[in-house]
Every structure is written in structure tokens, then in C-alpha cells.
Curated annotation (Swiss-Prot):
Residues binding NADPH, per UniProt: W11, R30, K103, A136, R251, V275, E277
Protein name: Glycerol-3-phosphate dehydrogenase [NAD(P)+]
GO MF: glycerol-3-phosphate dehydrogenase [NAD(P)+] activity; NAD binding
Catalytic reaction annotation: sn-glycerol 3-phosphate + NAD(+) = dihydroxyacetone phosphate + NADH + H(+); sn-glycerol 3-phosphate + NADP(+) = dihydroxyacetone phosphate + NADPH + H(+)
Organism: Nitrosomonas eutropha (strain DSM 101675 / C91 / Nm57)
Amino acid sequence: MNITVLGAGAWGTALAIYLSARHHVTLWTRNTGHLAELAALRVNQRYLPGQHLPDSIHLASALSDALEQAELVLVVVPVAGLRVTLQRIAALNQSLPLVLGCKGFEAGTAKLPCQVVEDVYSAEITCGVLSGPSFAQEVAMGLPAALTLASDDDAFARRIASEIHTSILRVYSSSDVVGVEVGGALKNVIAIAAGISDGLAFGNNARAALITRGLAEITRLGVALGGHRKTFTGLSGIGDLILTCTGDLSRNRQVGMMLAAGCQLPEILLEIGHVTEGVYTVREAHEMGRQLQIDMPVTQAVYSILYEQIPVESAIRNMLDREPGAETD
């Protein structure tokens, strides 16, 4: 299959490397300087150092060239750049099937990635979303992982899952696009909280409690938005949440640890140097929770630290001092 990967960040590059073993892959970046580096070094030194780009991967900076032979397009750009990227694709080809590899809510609209697709395309288009517990570095190294590919089109989800599934990267199909996307978005917010907990040396018990209660509020919002409750017990729910809250490669967890150390957000983002979606997702999640009257205490704590200048210790204390309730509430 001819697959074009749009976005040469860490995850886009890792997917391109993985897929190139069985497919014809084109990797696109709009940054011509970055493209020149990739072509010269055959390594993505900016975002995925140490991982060789196979010679079979074609590199492109012109979107028309990248899409010319494509049978499937993986869109792996930050959510902030998704709409404009989709508009450029749609202007060239309205019929190419898409699989989205980005996680979050669009700022200002609070729309999920597949909802942005619906906004952009004038006609119905086949679209899926790829999500689950997957650090780019490990996928590029060929270490085992498992993902979910969700689409409203069951046949498409099963077919594409089968195309990209191997014994190293197992891919399961789903029809719950909303549930898969909500899980992928909100786990980044909970991971910031987990990083704060770890940074304050609260211990393993506290981290486990945060993950569990975090899953509860992810599920509450996800179901309210139309997701299926059982989805949140799967790879794109609890699976991705556990990895992002515990793994040392988690950028969102790193944000939390640096907040606990007293660093300010601009300094943190500059040092990490990669997009950390949880920082932006928390604003939309907080507002949706408020509008829908959904109890989201972990999200509220992270939001208050990042955007209301509440000291870390005060925000955590406010969360811990909440009145007890039934676990299933």
C-alpha cells in the first residue's frame, strides 16, 4: 500500500519507520529546512534522534507530491495545525481516506480531530483515528506495542487495522471514534497531574489513585460526549493513560514534574521543545466539564495551576480536601 505520513515529528517519523517495512511510505514536512536535514542525515535529529530513516522512505515538502500516489494518508500533526493541514489536503483531493494520529481538542471549538475533518470536507470522507499506548521511540525501535484504529466505517477500520497490524505492533479495530479520541486527549491532562504527584514525592499509592480517579473523570466526560463506556477500559483509555502517567518518556508527565519543581510554564515548554498537548487540552476539557456539569477534580486542579496561577501545593490540597463520596459517582 502507498501510505503518506503527514508530519515529521516524533510520532509521524516513528510510524513512517515502522510502516516502511511492509509499505511504500512518503514522509511529509512543510519545513524545508527540516526536510533537508532528514535527507542529509536520514535521522530525525530534532524529534527522534538515534533512529535511522530507511532509504525506502520518500521525503517530501510539497503536499501535492506527497499525496500524488497515496492510497492512505496518516495525518500526524499537532491538533493546533490540523484544520489548516486538512484544508490543504481537501483542496488537492477530496476522496483520499484519512487516519488521524493526533490527540486533543481543537482550541476555541473544543472539537475532536474527526469532528474537524467533518467541518473541513464538503462531502463525506472515510476517516479513522489511531490511538493507544505508544511512545514513538519504542515503536521506531521495533519494540512490541498495541493500538486501536477506530472508524465509523467498520469495514474500513478492520481493513486498515489488518494492513498495518504485525506481531510487533498489534492493531485492534473499533467503531467508537469519540471514545477513542476522548481517551487519547484527556490522558495527557491526567499525566500532568501524575507528574506533579511524582515531583512532590507523593509515592506510588498516590499515583495509582490519580490514574484510577483520572480514568473516572475521563469516562464521565467521554460518555457525555457520546463515547462508549467500555472503550475507556481498552488500549486507547486505561492503556494509554497508564503509559502516559508512568513512563519516563512522557512529555506531559515531565511538565507536571517540572511544575512541582517550581518551574514556570513558558520555561517548561521551551526546555521540553516538543508539543505537549495536555497543556492545551486542559483548557477545553475544563470548559466542557463546566458546561456539562461534570465533576472533573483532577482536570480542575491542573487547569488552576496552569491558567489561574494557583500554587501547586494549594491546588493539590484543594483536591485532597474534597468531601468523600461513592467511588462509582
